[in-house]
């Protein structure tokens, strides 16, 4: 099925004899290799991240899915709406508008999971949101596209990549399930696997980012408006996702997680859908946007992680220079606060800053009598 973006824009079926542009030709030749390698790498990465998931916490998110519900609202409520508002604000052409809207309707990608781990987010919630959004995409993608294109002149429906969604689910659920099992049976070994996976994920992201910059060299001057949208779109998603999580009284850890999940989209699924729906001649007009969005969401993620690490180190240094009396006073203030968290970074230092007992303690839990009471005895 093909999409006719306007009454004057025809979308005939793709043919193998059609001449591809250089950028798309290189991408098409490496598409199969990239798909297989990325599937294996993502599978191994999700296995290592699954080693950080605890069964009890995961069941808690499923039994009380408030965080998942907020994340789904951000994913399929805010992101399509943001895409639609950007389309109206920049008065995009029909073909460009469809590309931006499809990106907004796609589920969250696995990139957000490793970024969530690096910012000390809620990994159980992150993996739950990625899995649930991918499953919900089977119905929510067609629904969102239908609702937002009611006023558009579309003669035929867009092609939903159900096969790609199914492959993504398999690459998510099976490795994560094995990781959860390893963490349940061998918790010490799972921590080692998690550290190795985090390093491998970082190297993989650096390679993907570098490859994206090389492929983007032919598209930097293609359309400035699309490049601008590809830069601000994920940033707006991160900001609005964080604000919605904050308004629904989620913890700071969950706010960071939902923010990253909201702005990070499954770029490969978006490109697959565009490839199934348009010809190569039309695809070259919007390929730069898809590639730029994936590149900018990577760069945004690295920037957020770097900012978090710097602020966390600064916070630890500040607390380390405090006098013991100030630390005890701050600890007493924390212990009397009914809130779940007290700082955006949620640096858990109560264990290290907690003052020890002032006197000897009885092994059975009863305090040793001192002062006048001891003399009376």
From Swiss-Prot:
Residues 51-67, 119-133, 181-195, 245-257, 307-377 are cytoplasmic. Residues 1-29, 89-97, 155-159, 217-223, 279-285 are extracellular. Coiled coil: none annotated. It is a multi-pass membrane protein. It catalyses: estrone 3-sulfate(out) + 2 Na(+)(out) = estrone 3-sulfate(in) + 2 Na(+)(in); 17beta-estradiol 3-sulfate(out) + 2 Na(+)(out) = 17beta-estradiol 3-sulfate(in) + 2 Na(+)(in); dehydroepiandrosterone 3-sulfate(out) + 2 Na(+)(out) = dehydroepiandrosterone 3-sulfate(in) + 2 Na(+)(in); androst-5-ene-diol 3-sulfate(out) + 2 Na(+)(out) = androst-5-ene-diol 3-sulfate(in) + 2 Na(+)(in). One of its GO terms (cellular component) is membrane. Transports sulfoconjugated steroid hormones from the extracellular compartment into the cytosol in a sodium-dependent manner without hydrolysis. Steroid sulfate hormones are commonly considered to be biologically inactive metabolites, that may be activated by steroid sulfatases into free steroids. May play an important role by delivering sulfoconjugated steroids to specific target cells in reproductive organs. May play a role transporting the estriol precursor 16alpha-hydroxydehydroepiandrosterone 3-sulfate (16a-OH-DHEAS) at the fetal blood vessel endothelium. Belongs to the bile acid:sodium symporter (BASS) (TC 2.A.28) family. NCBIfam families: bass. PANTHER family: SODIUM-BILE ACID COTRANSPORTER, SODIUM-DEPENDENT ORGANIC ANION TRANSPORTER. This is Sodium-dependent organic anion transporter. The gene is SLC10A6.
